[in-house]
């Protein structure tokens, strides 16, 4: 797009020292897009961000980190996609635990492409609405949001029209009922 070479890699490609992202930048990529389906883990959010920030700074290119959101079987994907500029600073943070579409303007330094072949895409440039970054959740909020999303997606993807919650009256039952209501509604 306007002579900007974009390196696209998948999941763990971004973590590999001298891996695909490094090779893409050496070949002339001015922007890296990393596509993920990284499951939720209470300790993963900060680790992801730190590693991508360090990689962007090292390579001196912006990185768009896209992560899947939703429940799938026993896994919950927390989303939380983000954009890091070439200095390693997060300039946009998407919501966690909910689907979202976002667009943004991003300044990139056009580099010479060091490759014999390239794919050129012509993209129509429309006026882009202003974005609002979203907060990330603390550990307790993250766990609760993951539970809600997992329950809601499981019920929706299995096309259940009703659910039955068995309660014994203890604190675990209170939490189960609260998660069910927050995820599915009180009906």
Each PLM stretch: what is its role?
Residues 15-99:
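CN hydrolase (nitrilase-like) catalytic-core segments centered on the catalytic cysteine
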């Amino acid at each position: 797009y306007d002579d900007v070479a974009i390196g696209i890699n998948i999941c763990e490609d971004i973590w590999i020292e001298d891996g695909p992202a490094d090779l893409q930048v050496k070949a002339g990529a001015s922007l890296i897009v990393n596509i993920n389906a990284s499951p939720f883990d209470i300790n993963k959010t900060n680790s992801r961000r730190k590693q991508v920030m360090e990689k962007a700074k090292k390579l001196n290119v912006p990185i768009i980190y896209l992560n899947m959101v939703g429940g799938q079987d026993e896994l919950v994907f927390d989303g939380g996609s983000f954009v890091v500029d070439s200095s390693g600073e997060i300039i946009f943070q998407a919501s966690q635990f909910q689907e979202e579409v976002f667009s943004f303007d991003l300044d990139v330094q056009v580099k010479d492409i060091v490759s014999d072949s390239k794919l050129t895409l012509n993209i129509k440039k429309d006026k882009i609405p202003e974005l609002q970054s979203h907060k990330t959740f603390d550990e307790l909020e993250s766990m609760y949001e993951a539970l809600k999303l997992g329950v809601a997606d499981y019920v929706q993807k299995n096309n259940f029209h009703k659910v039955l919650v068995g309660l014994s009256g203890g604190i675990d039952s209170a939490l189960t009922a609260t998660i069910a209501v927050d995820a599915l509604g009180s009906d």
